């Protein structure tokens, strides 16, 4: 029978081995992807999760706070970006063209995905953990499962402007816990840069803009001892510096857990 000291030594050596292996596997993230657009393609690794033809998360949500990403306008063409893509929530809503050329089942044609979630797997400087549907969309027609069977792919990507259908307008979802002293707003369906770096609101009849703070994902909030009175005009600034203003988009008598879209 092995002595207790021998057993402890084996356990310790095994732990060192695992720690070393884990350390070797870690790849530092690349520089943040910014709101710059062009023809240059960058290299990345891609994996997929969830159902083979699904939108990723079981609840069709993700770390950005969006819901129903399996439905229009996202239609399951979504992905989790690693640190330089997700950017602690500031990458939420940004759009990317992605493509793969290997294995042979890859079409080599670019498809567009929207960042709706994050991933922290340190396997490459840039890593997209895609929905099963988005991953399979890089395949030749009829060979989607062959691509998904690869599990992990080398791909090329570039940031592109987001283009939503004409009937999909910027939308502001007032989060569940909101009340006159606490207002949290999720911003989605932003054309152009897609991601938002600042949100302000203004009460009807007042000149002062009230700055909201980042809460999490694509959610912005304000806590105030003074009761807020709707309607609210909302202004957001995208990463590229574009400001957009939506007058009285959140109406008087607004309700929590309700979405309000621009006209």
Curated annotation (Swiss-Prot):
Question: Sorted alphabetically, which keywords does the UniProt record give?
Answer: Allergen, Glycoprotein, Secreted, Signal
Cellular component GO terms, alphabetical: extracellular region
Q: Which GO BP terms, alphabetically?
A: plant-type cell wall loosening; sexual reproduction
Provide the protein's localization.
Secreted
Q: Which domain of life is it from?
A: Eukaryota
**Span of the signal peptide:** 1-23
Q: Per the similarity annotation, which family is this?
A: Belongs to the expansin family. Expansin B subfamily.
State the protein's name. Answer: Pollen allergen Lol p 1
Lineage at the top is:
Eukaryota, Viridiplantae, Streptophyta, Embryophyta, Tracheophyta
């Amino acid at each position: 029978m092995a002595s207790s000291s021998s057993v402890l030594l084996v356990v310790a050596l095994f732990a060192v081995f695992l720690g070393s292996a884990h350390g070797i596997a870690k790849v530092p993230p690349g520089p943040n992807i910014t709101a710059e657009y062009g023809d240059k393609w960058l290299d990345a690794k891609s994996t997929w999760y969830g159902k083979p033809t699904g939108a990723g998360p079981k609840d069709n949500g993700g770390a950005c706070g969006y819901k129903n990403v399996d439905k229009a306008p996202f239609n399951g063409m979504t992905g989790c970006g690693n640190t330089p893509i997700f950017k602690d929530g500031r990458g939420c809503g940004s759009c990317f063209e992605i493509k793969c050329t290997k294995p042979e089942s890859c079409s080599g044609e670019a498809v567009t995905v929207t960042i709706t979630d994050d991933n922290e797997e340190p396997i490459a400087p840039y890593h997209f953990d895609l929905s099963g549907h988005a991953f399979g969309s890089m395949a030749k027609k009829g060979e989607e499962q062959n691509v998904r069977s690869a599990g992990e792919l080398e791909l090329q990507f570039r940031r592109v402007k987001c283009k939503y259908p004409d009937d999909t307008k910027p939308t502001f979802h007032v989060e569940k816990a909101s009340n006159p002293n606490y207002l949290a707003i999720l911003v989605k369906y932003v054309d152009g840069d897609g991601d938002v770096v600042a949100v302000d609101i203004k009460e009807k009849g007042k000149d002062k803009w009230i700055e909201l703070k980042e809460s999490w994902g694509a959610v912005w909030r304000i806590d105030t001892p003074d009761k807020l009175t709707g309607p609210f005009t909302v202004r957001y600034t995208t990463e590229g510096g574009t400001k957009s203003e939506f007058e009285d988009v959140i109406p008087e008598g607004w309700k929590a857990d309700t979405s309000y879209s621009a006209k």
